[in-house]
Amino acid sequence: LVGSEMCIRDSDIDIAVMLKAENKAFKIEKHTHSYPHCWRTDKPVLYYPLDSWFIRTTALRERMIELNKTIRWKPESTGTGRFGKWLEGLVDWNLSRSRFWGTPLPVWATEDYSEVKCIGSVEELMAEIERSIAAGVMQENPYRNFRVGDMSKENYSTENIDLHRPYVDSIVLVSSKGEPMRRESDLIDVWFDSGAMPYAQVHYPFENKEGFGQVYPADFIAEGVDQTRGWFFTLHAIASMLFDSVAFKNIISNGLVLDKN
């Protein structure tokens, strides 16, 4: 069926016939079952594997479990049970998302991935752009009006700088061998944004280093129990990786109430 213009769903029968003819199917029958549909178009979707970027959270699994034991959970059973068991079965964090809107993955790579750069700040990106221009890869700096170190709202206007797609995708860096490096097209998991909230809200570490320890870790947070694998985890994971610390000291995790529908 490779190369045919047949619709994926319409190929089911042909695939079944082929497997039967090649004696590779034990039994073929129709079976009614639930199937994922696009929430926007209400059309059936097809899942297939993609290459992704991961954070190796498994390397800190035991430490995250230890730090979790220092948090005061209400109810305690959520911390030791639902959240604690989640940490015990922790897998690496799939960080990348194949979408358009969101925080771009700040990773640039050569075509053969022999060299990869992860950019950690606007200042670093500006320096890399200048290197690219000097090497003849880029013609000009699209952020030339942006002033590094100026944290004013005027300086951060979209007229001076916009780090979202499609603008950031036009930036082509240069490798140590002079080869062009293009940004990975994926975005960052939006839950990473949520977990980075304690730092992002005060623009840490680029601003407000003094006094940051007075408001972090948080004394108290509260959210629904459904955030066990969402906000609670991403706060805990990022704090563990960055500071070997908890992100919050006390937490109330409320239950959920649903009506009959």
Predicted regions and their residues:
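Residue patterns forming the tRNA-binding/recognition surfaces of aminoacyl-tRNA synthetases
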Residues: S4-E5, R9-G149, L163, W231
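Alpha-helical recognition segments enriched in aromatics with Gly/Pro capping
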Residues: R99-W101, A109-E111, E128-I129, G136, ...
